[in-house]
């Protein structure tokens, strides 16, 4: 059996676990469905259900993706935190269009989100920064994220430096570290089904109103 034949068997084996879909109406909003699906993912025992792919694109049109952790969400959008000097932050500053993807294989579900980003407030970034464990706070100061290491022990030396510097008192919130809020204008909920006749629920924002429809798989 080839690798692709094995993968096909695994895919077929998992087709019986699809969960029911919500009924759509003109009043249905994507944040309602996201909240329910995220709760389902949490209850399923999936490791890090808050993990999501963030795809950005630079000014030359070159896309890049990476996994980050969702830290907050509401009707306004989806929030994650990072170093503002990282590659993704530079790309988001150049081009504020972004895509997110949640993939929960155990549930045969994925959520695809398209939107634009904006920085969260300094206070919101500082509040979250100070909620992190102390090691992560110091590590944010030590890491020049996405920059080349000059030698193997450089990061260890920088970590040691900041551990000494902030050995007493509160670790200050660095200005180069904070949150991005993804403000969605399109959200698609995908649910796997037998015979690859998958369900696709699509929401598109029209002004302040969310319009919904279903798509062919």
Swiss-Prot record:
InterPro entries: Pyridox_Oxase, Pyridox_Oxase_CS, Pyridox_Oxase_N, Pyridoxamine_oxidase_dimer_C, Split_barrel_FMN-bd. Substrate binds at residues 71, 128, 132, 136, 196-198. Pathway: Cofactor metabolism; pyridoxal 5'-phosphate salvage; pyridoxal 5'-phosphate from pyridoxamine 5'-phosphate: step 1/1; Cofactor metabolism; pyridoxal 5'-phosphate salvage; pyridoxal 5'-phosphate from pyridoxine 5'-phosphate: step 1/1. Binds 1 FMN per subunit. GO terms for molecular function: FMN binding; pyridoxamine phosphate oxidase activity. SUPFAM superfamilies: FMN-binding split barrel. FMN binds at residues 66-71, 81-82, 87-88, 110, 145-146, 190, 200. Disulfide bonds: none annotated. It holds the Pfam family PNP_phzG_C. One of its GO terms (biological process) is pyridoxine biosynthetic process. Keywords: Flavoprotein, FMN, Oxidoreductase, Pyridoxine biosynthesis. It is an enzyme of class 1 (oxidoreductase). Its cofactor is FMN. Its EC number is 1.4.3.5. It catalyses: pyridoxamine 5'-phosphate + O2 + H2O = pyridoxal 5'-phosphate + H2O2 + NH4(+); pyridoxine 5'-phosphate + O2 = pyridoxal 5'-phosphate + H2O2. Belongs to the pyridoxamine 5'-phosphate oxidase family. Catalyzes the oxidation of either pyridoxine 5'-phosphate (PNP) or pyridoxamine 5'-phosphate (PMP) into pyridoxal 5'-phosphate (PLP). Homodimer. NCBIfam families: pdxH (TIGR00558), PRK05679.1 (NF004231). This is Pyridoxine/pyridoxamine 5'-phosphate oxidase. The gene is pdxH.
């Amino acid at each position: 059996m080839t690798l692709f034949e094995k993968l096909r068997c695994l895919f077929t084996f998992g087709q019986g676990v699809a969960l029911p879909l919500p009924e759509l109406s003109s009043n249905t909003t994507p944040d309602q469905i996201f909240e329910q699906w995220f709760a389902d993912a949490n209850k399923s025992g999936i490791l890090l259900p808050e993990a999501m792919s963030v795809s950005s694109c630079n000014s030359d049109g070159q896309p890049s993706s990476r996994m980050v952790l969702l830290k907050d969400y509401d009707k306004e959008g989806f929030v994650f935190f990072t170093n503002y000097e990282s590659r993704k932050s530079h790309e988001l500053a150049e081009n504020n269009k972004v895509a997110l993807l949640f993939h929960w294989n155990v549930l045969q579900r994925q959520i695809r989100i398209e939107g634009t980003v904006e920085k969260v407030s300094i206070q919101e970034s500082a509040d979250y920064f100070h909620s992190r464990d102390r090691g992560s706070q110091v590590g944010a100061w030590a890491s020049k994220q996405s920059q080349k290491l000059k030698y193997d022990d450089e990061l260890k030396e920088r970590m040691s430096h900041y551990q000494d510097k902030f050995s007493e008192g509160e670790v200050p919130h660095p200005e180069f570290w904070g949150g991005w809020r993804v403000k969605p204008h399109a959200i698609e909920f995908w649910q796997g089904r037998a015979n690859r006749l998958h369900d696709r629920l699509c929401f598109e924002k029209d002004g302040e109103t969310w319009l919904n429809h279903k798509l062919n798989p």
